């Protein structure tokens, strides 16, 4: 590290808990306890190493100042000479491990917040066996992984359940020929589940996630069939057995008229769903409504904390969005991409 190098800090947030000061670095999702010396250093953004050593000489020797700067650089708290994030990114060669199959670009429901034009994406139809098998062949050919993942999506994927079964059987044959293993997930509205479908999903260990937005009143405001009839009663009945066996996850969607995260979570927890991710319908929320939803989300975080403090760990663990966020902080590292599309997964 040269005396003429300029030091720049990545975006961060400082907060205090019980008189102890912490720094959260947004770039690398790292969390650190800091002292007054580091607080002073943070005020010197854009300064040279030489001027930083001079400013900190009351607190640290020159060697200790360099050691501190080096440690912070290694932890992705700072960079030298204002290197942009784009310049620091390395383009990774794609090694696919997951494939999403849009089995049907059709849906038997007409949810108000659907981003896929009623599940049709302006190109209504169902996937053919040939397309599905070619996609799987491409996945196998372009992956060095031993465990591969197939996600069944729509529209409503159960509208093309025969193809789902053919895909699973095709993957079983590939496993026998190559030794590669496959795991599966399906995201469905749950209204088309039958005893036979449930049996097949269970026997083939296909992890099932259904969409349900909380109470009957709240759910049926936005999740309804073509005739505007609500879906709650049908979903609860169709998933009864799988819920009792702890085999199905519920994904809830927050909207301006259904933004009480705590109420949504507690209702779905009472229905015995194994996990409960909650997301916002971004296409239905304006700035003012977002502020209200943010307030509800903060209350939800405090509720999560309450569950932890009262040792209700099993219940808290179902709040998968918050658990995943904590894991990103615990195992903090730089994420140059929001997801693995085009690098580890494709559709």
Task: Indicate residue ranges for each PLM-predicted region.
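Basic amphipathic alpha-helical segments that dock to polyanions
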Residues: 41, 51-79
